[in-house]
């Protein structure tokens, strides 16, 4: 992009297409490696720096394509520059419009690792899956696996545009939207109406190899017309919300660590079984 066009750049959110797979994957890998907590988790899930290899990137893209042929509730969006069409950011989410049986929700582990590496990785990923099961079980909701902005396009409203797109889906579907944030992205989500749940996930320093335990902020945003908290919604069994006749729904004008890791697990597992 020419320097003179930067100020007039407007992020546009569109559905990602098959030719976008590599570009979208490159965005979230770049974003992942640029964030401290995300980078830490990568070294656990993919020890030895394999995520940097071209073979891994190609296999991941192939696994993503295979997964797209069978996924019926997971959607990938791209955020592009309205002048050049460059992919600046991406979002990935499960939009669960129907209740799901236990078989569909089962956590299958980390099949490409063995021994202590697998045990360690599943100590990180397992609690994320368990918490989502605890909070929602088979209830209808939106789960954000990833919102990521390429480091070259930060501070241009890309992350905000993607979050606003998600909020719009939340309002239009009438479903709560749930995500695992990171300490660095949590303030933006709070500013945009997400609340931190009282439930906690704390990764132990012994597992992470860090000097201190790290807490994963769990966040939810309710539809704007729900007028109840998430705890109240959960206590009432996730009721349908009556939409006002003239609902004012916002039209849409980084990285989420836990969800993105779980998404990579699904893709690699799909590739291994293809």
Question: For each of these PLM feature ranges, what is it?
Answer:
Residues 146-149, 155-168:
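Conserved acetyl-CoA-binding loop-helix of GNAT-fold acetyltransferases
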Residues 39, 51, 55, 67-73, ...:
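Conserved acyl-donor/pantetheine-binding loop and adjacent beta-alpha core of acyl/acetyltransferases
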Residues 140-142, 169-182:
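Conserved GNAT acetyl-CoA-binding A-motif
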Residues 12-26, 32-39:
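A short beta-loop-alpha structural element at the N-terminal edge
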Residues 16, 147-149, 185:
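Hydrophobic adenine-recognition pocket in adenosine-nucleotide-binding enzymes
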Residues 160, 172-174, 183-203:
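Conserved active-site alpha-helix within GNAT-family acetyltransferase domains
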Residues 35-63:
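Conserved GNAT-fold acetyl-CoA-binding loop/helix
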Residues 75-78, 217:
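Hydrophobic beta-strand residues of extracellular immunoglobulin-like
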């Amino acid at each position: 992009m020419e320097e003179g066009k930067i100020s007039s750049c407007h992020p546009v959110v569109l559905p990602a297409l098959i030719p976008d797979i590599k570009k979208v994957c490159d965005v979230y890998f770049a974003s992942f490696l640029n964030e401290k907590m995300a980078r830490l988790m990568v070294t656990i899930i993919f020890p030895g720096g394999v995520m940097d290899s071209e073979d891994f990137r190609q296999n991941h893209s192939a696994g993503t394509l295979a997964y797209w042929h069978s996924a019926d509730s997971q959607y990938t969006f791209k955020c592009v520059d309205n002048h050049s069409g460059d992919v600046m950011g991406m979002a990935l989410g499960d939009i669960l419009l129907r209740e799901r049986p236990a078989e569909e929700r089962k956590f299958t582990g980390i099949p490409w690792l063995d021994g202590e590496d697998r045990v360690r990785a599943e100590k990180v990923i397992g609690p994320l899956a368990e918490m989502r099961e605890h909070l929602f079980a088979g209830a209808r909701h939106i789960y954000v696996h990833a919102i990521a902005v390429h480091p070259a396009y930060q501070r241009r409203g890309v992350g905000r545009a993607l979050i606003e797109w998600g909020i719009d889906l939340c309002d239009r579907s009438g479903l709560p939207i749930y995500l695992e944030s990171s300490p660095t992205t949590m303030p933006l989500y709070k500013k945009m109406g997400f609340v931190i749940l009282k439930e906690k996930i704390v990764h132990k320093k012994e597992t992470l190899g860090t000097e201190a335990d790290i807490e994963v902020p769990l966040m939810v945003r309710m539809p704007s017309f729900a007028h109840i908290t998430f705890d109240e919604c959960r206590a009432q069994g996730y009721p349908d919300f009556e939409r006002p006749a003239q609902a004012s729904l916002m039209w849409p004008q980084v990285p989420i660590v836990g969800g993105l890791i779980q998404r990579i697990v699904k893709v690699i597992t799909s590739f291994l079984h293809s």
